[in-house]
């Protein structure tokens, strides 16, 4: 019998996606393969651009053209040959932020099983309020008969228990919140009189003659609002809709007249305007007078009274959704035993459909979350683990899982659960591709492929590959010293413990919010403070939902958020949140336009002899609106081809070859310091490092480019589209306008800035922090990366666990103090 050869590896030949330099590489199958390398070295190009693109495309190609035309399809990857690639699933680095209707329960699909449980297994209430014992008649779709009053009714289906469908609260529509008028916004300055415009809604949402009607209602309009009697203020805010006969004088036309007009109090003015809103522009005028409150009808549960009626083990659906997942699983497992014997087989099936996926989520450290938690309030790491759990719920075999930075948002103690899931996937006969920088998770790989040696045009090569010991011993490897622990990771001189607060203190006092208990927090001014803690311990709530909004409110002279009791931030005039959200969604935004270099270059080219000879102005050199933009692609650099039954194909514009400019733009040249010449399209095609050499004598341009180089972005080309940048690159580019300024009155807040950064890039990031600190800034960072934590002046460690088990400050101090604090889990990992 002929022996069949079973492929042992995916064979990639001559891959040239993005910056890959025609590489040949074999990726072992049935193993965890880590892909490492500095930012921009080609890791994602190999993992997502080749392996995932080909694995998913070939699977979709097996479907009928009728099915495929309804799907978004990937184009063929830029590679000569890929052999033995399995069907592929990718978990991207940054899952999209879900809408307001999405919760942890809907996102994980656990709520589907729970709703089915309540529909089929619960005690249902008859129209007269009597509860019936659980019955198999529900599953059979038969009517139920109330033994007490004889009423006949049908039990609600699972769909009728869904807040996104028939079970929605009629008042809030299943959102759980309602928009109401915020009284604090109606009279923002009570030192003004009503005649001077004290009542804000009457100025922007109502005719000016409402002041005259108010006067007719008996309110003095010529005294400061604060001096009005309580009765007069009540008329302004809630007065009755009485019709008044008034004389009015139109200041513009200088005409007078009289008319009958109904009084609209300040509150009703806003409510009336809200009811008439038809577009976003109208909403913008009204929303400054609104606040979001918990819906009074459903109390934030999103469900109608009927959907909250069924009871299972004594709890309603909304009460079960309020339990942390770890508790809920135990409660659900007790459901079959609480039912009549004939219902138990069905109950066990439904319970199993709930507990299987729930166990995965708990393995990934999400047991502290409740099913009713709004998905938009989850951190990136939590959303990514939700996505991972959903992808691995069905025990597949022979699938290639591509995980793009799964360690995002994970404390070192949470990575254990993640590695468990990866090993389970391998045990089931799958393959895992792991794009990551975290040495703790890379050590779990059976094989490492390292890309490099640098970023951008100088990357795209395989510089090392092999097992962990082989990589550690390979002198060409850049990740090897970090895997072996031999690299020096302390990169900055930290403040001494007794001088930490020498430049001042930021003090924040908060009441309970989500699972975070009331807190009193001190942060040293002019220092690098890192907020640490396991996932769900309250870092995001403390920094992004408390500190940042409180500072913004104080700077703008507004009231503090309701849960913030006090804030002492003397001398702070700016707070800047630098997160990893992509910069724009438009291909017209490039590194040069975002950094402000493009305008300077257009002006320089317009002053050149060539431009003057042709009569070109600076505006002509704009690839968005100028006369020199490419007419074929309108300055986008690419054209989209609509091929029926096949995916739309975006190709570089055949006219300008991706440069965005017409040929005439190539005739206008500037001369560099060494006598070389370049047109604006050629300059936009240079990376920052090369452009600095060419622009040495262009002072303003050179200064801006050197800041990008200082931020570790020297490998980006000036014409690179900003939406395509990684999270870490986007964060650093946002800082370009801040470096070099005096920042003593500024607080910079970073949300996991080490995302997507190789340990060598983390050292560049620490240099960026130091540049801000040298200019007097206060830097606050939410971070899990141990190298960043080690370099902090001050650490605030949240915990001890996630959810209800967290929400407290377990330790704070210098890294040495945290290491020696037995209560700190972070300290335990810092000591290693």
How does the language model describe each region?
Residues 1-832:
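Conserved phosphate-binding elements of NTP-dependent enzyme cores
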